[in-house]
Amino acid sequence: MEVVLVSVWGFMDVYKLHPKFDLILDRFDTIQKEFKDNLEHIQFGHWYDDFAHSKSGGIYNPVAAPLYGELDQEQEQLSMIEQFGKDFYEKDGLRTHKNVNWVPTLTKTLQDIGITRRASIARMKPKAKIPLHRDGDPNPPDGILLRGIIGLDVPVEEGKKCYIMVRDRPKKTWHTRDIKNKSICLFQPNAIHSVINQINGWRYVVLFDTVVWFENYPEVVKSCRTTGVWANLD
């Protein structure tokens, strides 16, 4: 399994954050089957605060299906709460959407791994592109927010692929990673990035947020202070 963290200051091993991440691979067949079997029941909404993700021709497209998020991170979940307020409830200390009932193995696996800040399922149209942008999610004062993409149901088509490009600011280069079934890419969402789907089919991924806490990774703090890019200035 290829596991990559792309950020403005370099790479990081995802297993340092979530050592049990291989549970996704161990349970992937069940996770994918549950998703495919229940796709018609899953509710998708939009991130109306992110035009690059959600807007096309002046019309918002349903692109994200919320699963859960931490109770004290309401601002990050606000657009989904406003759309699906009645469908959220509290479970195990998390703000949970009824979508989790259709993907129980995925939900349990993410939480077994220790991913609690936010999780959702995102879809992308055939032959579509999310243009270069940066997400507006703020970093916590004592850490750095990271976003993960797990390939959940990505069609296979010869000569075509779905991929993400993330800018490496210090090197003035781009990191490119394919998005395919079982692939995992973890990056800093307020780094400039773009997603391209060349495939003639809908692409579905799991999106999740997690945090590198400075107290646990002092080398990250040292690197950020040395490079001066921790504040994501461009």
Q: Where would I find each of the regions flagged by the language model?
A:
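Catalytic core of Fe(II)/2-oxoglutarate
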Residues: 162-234
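Hydrophobic transmembrane signal anchors and adjacent membrane-proximal interface regions, especially
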Residues: 3-10, 14-19, 23-26, 44, ...
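Intrinsically disordered, low-complexity peptide-like regions
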Residues: 11, 59, 131-133, 207
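Short loop/turn segments at secondary-structure transitions that flank enzyme active sites
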Residues: 37, 127, 154-156, 193, ...
